[in-house]
Curated annotation (Swiss-Prot):
Belongs to the bacterial solute-binding protein 1 family. WtpA subfamily. Pfam families: SBP_bac_11. InterPro entries: ModA/WtpA (IPR050682). The keyword Signal applies. This is Uncharacterized solute-binding protein SSO1031.
Length: 402
């Protein structure tokens, strides 16, 4: 150690003979210098080998902080893994409803739900083509064929749990059109009297004097419904010429085509688009105005009208397939794609949705109670069979019966 190494030098300086020109004073000075060096060495050695309390506290604090940060990251990762979040693909018009349900579900279970909205047919195409399966739950609207379009991921079953109806949506800007008063007066008289003349005038003005948003029927059922409504109106009010108003729309340069009706909200609110065909619930959720359609044109849940709806059809093309889709009521379906991950949480979410249908009337949809189970295979999962046995579901038949 340092102090032991210097000890002989101190002793040597004390007993050094006073010769060779050294005086006693010089000897004392040397001794003092050596002693100071020894003391400094001792203090330095002690500080190096015995850190002060303040240094220890600081070091301890830094270590503790680092440990907490590491624990937080680990905990966060664990929570994400254990919470088993799910992704829900939903028809774009029902984003508001599903975001509401997702928040309620997460509050009740602490399981996060990621909601993705788009046209039902487009979402089905994604489920069919992407690997791994991109959605844990699929909620298409209107046509059960959207479930069949998931290809090898088609689960063979779907539950209809909400009903809606078509309408013609507009904003306050639309009422400033020079043709608005004429259109609205004919609409009012048509709804009151069901006179063919007023209905003809209404649809003629709608299809020729206004800008219209009609979603691509190959990606969004709302576009498909729009053309079916025009077919029915043509048959009823234009001398049974089923294509009359369809041709007028296709000749109108102010018809805007988009992948989803969701694309029309901003133009409607900005006044750059006059009308679009959509669901009542969508108009309400977006704070837009709408013209209600009579039961025979609305595709609502009217049992006496279902045969009438089915007499009209429109061809669409999805994934290279041409499909003829017949009219049927606007139902919102829920299912789990085949080979989807995290299916236990997906079943839990379905049970939650079916248990909270009554809360959704605020969105102007009609809960179907009990919900209707459709299938095209005998392989109905046990959790769904349990819901059927408990009475929460009612068997409604094969896909072909929708």
């Amino acid at each position: 150690m340092l102090e032991k190494n210097l000890l002989p030098e101190i002793l040597l300086a004390i007993h050094m003979p006073l010769n060779k020109g050294l005086t006693r004073v010089k000897a004392i000075v040397i001794i003092i210098v050596v002693i100071i060096a020894v003391i400094a060495g001792v203090v330095g050695y002690y500080l190096i080998n015995h850190p002060s309390n303040s240094v220890t506290t600081s070091s301890s604090s830094t270590t503790t902080s680092s440990s907490l940060s590491s624990t937080s990251i680990s905990s966060s990762t664990t929570n994400i893994t254990s919470s088993q979040g799910i992704t829900v693909f939903v028809a774009g018009a029902y984003l508001a409803i599903l975001n509401y349900l997702a928040d309620q579900f997460q509050n009740a279970t602490e399981i996060p739900v990621h909601v993705v909205g788009s046209g039902s047919f487009a979402l089905a195409s994604q489920i069919a083509s992407q690997t791994p399966v991109p959605a844990n739950v699929f909620i298409p609207v209107a046509y059960i064929q959207a479930v069949e379009l998931t290809g090898s991921r088609n689960p063979g079953w779907a539950i209809a749990f909400l009903s809606d109806q078509m309408t013609i949506v507009y904003s306050n800007y639309t009422t400033k059109s020079p043709y608005w008063s004429q259109l609205y007066s004919n609409y009012t008289m048509a709804m009151e009297t069901n006179n063919t003349k007023y209905w003809y005038n209404f649809f003629y003005l709608l299809t020729t004097r206004f800008s219209l948003g009609i979603a691509n029927p190959n990606t969004d059922p709302e576009g498909l419904y729009a053309y079916l409504i025009l077919q029915m109106a043509s048959y009823l009010y234009a001398n049974h010429n089923i294509s009359y108003f369809v041709h007028l729309v296709k000749a109108n340069p102010n018809v805007k085509v988009a992948p989803s009706t969701a694309n029309y909200v901003a133009p409607l609110k900005a006044g750059t688009l006059d009308f679009t065909f959509s669901y009542v619930s969508y108009a309400v959720s977006q704070g837009l105005e709408y013209l209600k359609l009579p039961p025979w044109l609305s595709f609502g849940y009217y049992p006496n009208e279902t045969t009438w709806y089915s007499q009209f059809a429109y061809n669409i093309s999805v994934n290279g397939q041409t499909l003829t889709i017949h009219g049927n009521p606007v139902y919102l379906y829920i299912t789990i794609p085949l080979n989807a991950s995290n299916i236990q949480t997906a079943y839990q979410f379905i049970g939650f949705v079916l248990g909270h249908e009554s809360q959704l009337t605020r969105f102007n949809v009609i809960p179907i109670q009990p919900a209707l189970l459709y299938n095209e295979t005998s392989n109905i999962p046990q959790p769904i069979l349990n819901l059927l046995k408990s009475g929460e579901l009612k068997y409604a038949g094969n896909f072909s019966e929708v």
